[in-house]
């Protein structure tokens, strides 16, 4: 060892722009950032949760209480905070709902862990205890789940309605939940349920009550020629991922025309090719054609002459939905088309929807692709309605896949909190403290539901625990009346996987953050802050060691 090292002189291995925060400072910094994210969405939880107005740099406004939308729209730079954002995204991808619950759980687990760290409990010990508690929690939920079948339509509609609660769809919740269940059951097949086959068309104008389900596909296009029929009944449909145009040569060539007759010959030949294309469609019996690319003007003329309704530049996703709905096949080249490739619909026609012309492909037998038309008075209303419907579609799909649900209203969390406290007694070592902290953290959900409903959280928790001590697993908090009621009887239920995924994701995120004891930044992670003495940066600002805050979240932790 060199003399310099023996004298305690540190060896500099990082660049001068690099920043490093280690030990308790790093843990505290990351925990603070994670808690700030959870705090930002906490007031949106439950049927009486508040909305957030998010304004981006371009002045675009989003009004929502959907957890994952809020976090996606916020300008979050802090790496630990982004881990919590990923929790909400995972929850959304896996089950479609419960994003706010997952994030709040993660934030509270970090808060409880901070107290244990202050009491000299090692982060690894906390991580082990949290994982044991999470496994036990999932086991308890599995044991108490309620079985649901595809035939239990009443329960399915209640699940759909629960997912919409507090998301701007209250006035038409009964109608919308019926539409959602109809849509999911319509696209269900032997391979499972792909909610991407439920297309959502937003229409500004009318009321939410005017929303409807079309068993078929709506294409946001018009006929290419006004001389084409406005509607076709009992239509054979060609779906072409190609152009009805004369193909250009791949090699640039120059042709010298010395005689006007030669030019006319070129034009005649081009017209002949286009007519042959249309003749191919007529020959296979097509009454309507949807094309993914362009349609030449001359081809449009011949199509109209043959009474074929044509649509050009349809989106690839629309072509796939058309094929699924009508039983047709997307053909990549017109030369390959055969009669067996055509789909069938009882009606193909152009209709006015909210002032815009769209093509409706309806009356499809056993349609495996459907369209929900959502109406509302303003753009903000239909946007939030779309988010509510997407959540609802996700939970109905998850319920049909798993066949198990749980009561809502904070009932599962209250039961888990009690059972995990008992379980902690059987856990040896300091992990017992972590299991108890996990149980304490789960109380955040019923407590937040009570706070957001303007109720006393302590009184509500006491009532809930008392009922659960008496063996009432389904006892949950009614945010409208403030009473503790049987949520299963009330029809407030949600998929089992929403809760298990929320616990799993929150636990993994919290454990990952707790195990970080060193943050090394290769450059300036100031998060866009100026670094001036006057800039407070808000709750999640300082990252210790000169590291930055959470960008657009500076000061938002306390504001929300």
Curated annotation (Swiss-Prot):
A GO molecular function held by the record: ATP binding
Q: Please give the InterPro entries that the UniProt record associates with this protein.
A: Chaperone_TCP-1, Chaperonin_TCP-1_CS, Cpn60/GroEL/TCP-1, GroEL-like_apical_dom_sf, GROEL-like_equatorial_sf, TCP-1-like_intermed_sf, TCP-1_chaperonin, thermosome_alpha
Please list where the region (Disordered) is annotated: 525-550
Keywords carried by this UniProt record: ATP-binding, Chaperone, Nucleotide-binding, Stress response
Q: Which residues cross the membrane?
A: none
Q: Does the keyword Chaperone apply?
A: yes
Transferase listed as a keyword: no
Induction is noted as: By heat shock (at protein level).
Indicate, by first and last residue, each region the UniProt record lists as having compositional bias (Gly residues).
538-550
Q: Which Pfam families match?
A: Cpn60_TCP1
Miscellaneous remark of the record:
Can substitute for loss of cct2 or cct3. One of either cct1 or cct2 is required for growth.
- State whether it acts alone or in a complex, and with which partners, per the record: The thermosome or CCT complex is a oligomeric complex of two octameric double-ring structures; the complex is probably a heterooligomer of CCT1, CCT2 and CCT3 with yet unknown stoichiometry.
Report the family membership.
Answer: Belongs to the TCP-1 chaperonin family.
The record describes the protein's role as: Molecular chaperone that assists in the folding or refolding of nascent or denatured proteins along with ATP hydrolysis. ATPase activity is highest in thermosome assemblies containing CCT1:CCT2, followed by assemblies containing CCT1:CCT2:CCT3. Required for thermosome ATPase activity. Not required for growth.
Protein name listed in UniProt: Thermosome subunit 1
> Which organism was this protein described from?
Haloferax volcanii (strain ATCC 29605 / DSM 3757 / JCM 8879 / NBRC 14742 / NCIMB 2012 / VKM B-1768 / DS2) (Halobacterium volcanii)
């Amino acid at each position: 060892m060199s003399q310099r090292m023996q004298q305690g002189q540190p060896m500099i291995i990082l660049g001068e722009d690099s920043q490093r925060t280690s030990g308790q400072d790093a843990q505290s910094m990351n925990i603070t950032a994670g808690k700030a994210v959870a705090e930002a969405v906490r007031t949106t939880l439950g049927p009486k949760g508040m909305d957030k107005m998010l304004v981006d740099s371009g002045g675009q406004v989003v009004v929502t209480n959907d957890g994952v939308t809020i976090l996606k729209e916020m300008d979050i730079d802090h790496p630990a905070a982004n881990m919590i954002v990923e929790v909400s995204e995972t929850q959304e991808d896996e089950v479609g709902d419960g994003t706010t619950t997952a994030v709040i759980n993660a934030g509270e687990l970090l808060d409880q862990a901070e107290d244990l760290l202050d009491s000299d409990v090692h982060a690894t010990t906390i991580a082990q205890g949290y994982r044991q508690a999470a496994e036990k929690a999932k086991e308890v939920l599995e044991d108490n789940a309620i079985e649901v079948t595809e035939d239990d339509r009443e329960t399915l509609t209640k699940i759909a309605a629960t997912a919409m609660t507090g998301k701007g769809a209250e006035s038409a919740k009964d109608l919308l939940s019926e539409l959602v269940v109809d849509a999911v059951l319509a696209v269900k097949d032997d391979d499972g349920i792909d909610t991407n086959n439920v297309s959502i068309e937003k229409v500004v104008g009318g009321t939410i009550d005017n929303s409807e389900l079309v068993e078929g596909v709506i294409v946001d296009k018009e006929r290419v020629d006004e001389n084409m029929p406005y509607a076709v009944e009992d239509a054979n449909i060609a779906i072409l991922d190609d152009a009805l145009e004369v193909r250009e040569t791949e090699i640039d060539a120059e042709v010298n025309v010395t005689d006007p007759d030669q030019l006319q010959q070129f034009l005649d030949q081009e017209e002949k090719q286009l007519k042959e294309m249309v003749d191919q469609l007529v020959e296979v019996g097509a009454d309507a054609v949807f094309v993914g690319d362009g349609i030449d003007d001359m081809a449009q003329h011949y199509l109209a002459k043959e009474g074929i309704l044509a649509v050009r530049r349809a989106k690839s996703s629309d072509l796939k939905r058309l094929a699924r709905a009508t039983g047709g096949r997307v053909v990549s080249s017109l030369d390959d088309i055969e009669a067996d490739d055509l789909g069938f619909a009882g009606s193909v026609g152009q209709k006015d929807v909210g002032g815009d012309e769209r093509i409706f492909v309806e009356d499809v037998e056993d349609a495996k692709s459907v369209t929900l038309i959502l109406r509302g008075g303003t753009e903000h209303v239909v946007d939030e309605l779309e988010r509510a419907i997407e959540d609802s579609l996700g939970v109905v799909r998850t319920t049909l896949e798993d066949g198990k649900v749980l009561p809502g209203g904070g009932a599962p969390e209250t039961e888990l909190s009690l059972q995990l406290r008992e379980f902690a007694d059987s856990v040896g070592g300091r992990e017992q403290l972590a299991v108890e902290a996990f149980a304490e953290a789960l109380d955040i959900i019923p407590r937040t539901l009570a706070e957001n409903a303007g109720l006393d959280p302590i009184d509500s928790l006491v009532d809930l625990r008392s009922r659960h001590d008496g063996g009432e697993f389904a006892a949950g908090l009614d945010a409208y009346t403030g009473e503790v009621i049987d949520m299963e009887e009330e029809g407030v239920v949600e998929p089992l996987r929403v809760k298990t995924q929320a616990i799993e994701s929150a636990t993994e995120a919290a454990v990952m953050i707790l195990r970080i004891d060193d943050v090394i930044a290769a450059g300036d992670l100031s998060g866009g802050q100026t670094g001036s003495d006057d800039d407070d940066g808000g709750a999640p600002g300082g990252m210790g060691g000169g590291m930055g805050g959470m960008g657009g979240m500076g000061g938002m932790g306390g504001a929300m």
